[in-house]
Amino acid sequence: MDRREFVASFAALGATAALPTTASAQPEGQTSGNSGSPASPADALWPATLRKETTRQLTTFNLSRKSKTIPIPRGKRVTIGEVKGQGYIAQFWLTFPGWFWQHWNPTAPVNQSILKTLILRIYWDGADQPAVAVPVGDFFGAGLCEVASFASRYFGTSSGGFFCKWPMPFRKSFRVELENLDAELNTEVFCNILYQLSDSLPEPLGWFHAQFNTAQNKGPAPVQIAEARGRGHYAGCLLYMQGQERNYLSFLEAPEHVYVDADWEAPRIVGTGLEDYFLGGWYFREGSFIGPYHGVPIKDALNASVAMYRVHETDAIRFEQRIKFAFVNPWSPDRLKPFCFSSVAFLYLDKPDGQGTPLPSAKELLCWYRIRNTDHQSIP
């Protein structure tokens, strides 16, 4: 498959997976990536483009038992499914009870913290380490353990459901697991993963990775977002933050510091503030907003809580050997107060094995000082 066919058949699904080629390899008049508007007539006509692919769906629905879900008991790790072949995941959707009152089971326990203690893992091509090892809430946009419906280009929470549309290529296989680390709640998951099988994939094409970080911070320590080695690019992140004191938002003073390849001692890219990186300003003075490539689903100043996301396409941060991304507050330590955070960084790398830091304990995952109850009457 040549580069022009790649743009026609795959770019509109998110060309974020394509690792960079040299300028000389680029067809004349064609741009790499996808800025949200067509780069060529082929991009504009993508919905009408006929492609030789086999569409399938991995689902928790069991036709023989007429059961829609797979149970995930507390303390258990369950394989949702494994697929052999070559292709890419085009859409990932799931939902599960436990974080809201269940009208069909009114005495069932409810705890929004299960959005932190239910862990999603994805393995590519027989790799030993998962490329994705992230709490479900953090991965889809509900890392504050509050669910506020929003839809970005690649992920979101939609009125009780959780979806992801990052293109996720695989050459031989993929496997999806869920682990329930909650001390009290059993749950069951509804899941549909639509994937396309193909005899050929465009090259060079990276494997999708999601790195999770979390900590309680006394104030001046850097907020680590991502660190990876090899060739690839950084494609964006979700970041959730909360001050220990109410009305404290000065953690937003920390600009991004991005270290790339030979620029390891001093950052290659430095910003002007944390909210500036997410393309807002003045501590997001107008409150929450939603866009395809950046947004703030939650800003609760009284609770000192902010949920933010940004997606990179044509502005992806490329690297050949390594990358490190952190937010670093320039204020003197005496001006800073404690806060906590959790984050998910999205990358495409030239290897399928995960490189993220090991997941902390369930107790450490529950980093928030306060969880706001967002449950409400919900009877169809």
Which role fits each region the language model picked out?
Residues 31-380:
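Beta-strand-centric surfaces of beta-sandwich/beta-rich domains
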Residues 5-25:
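N-terminal export signals
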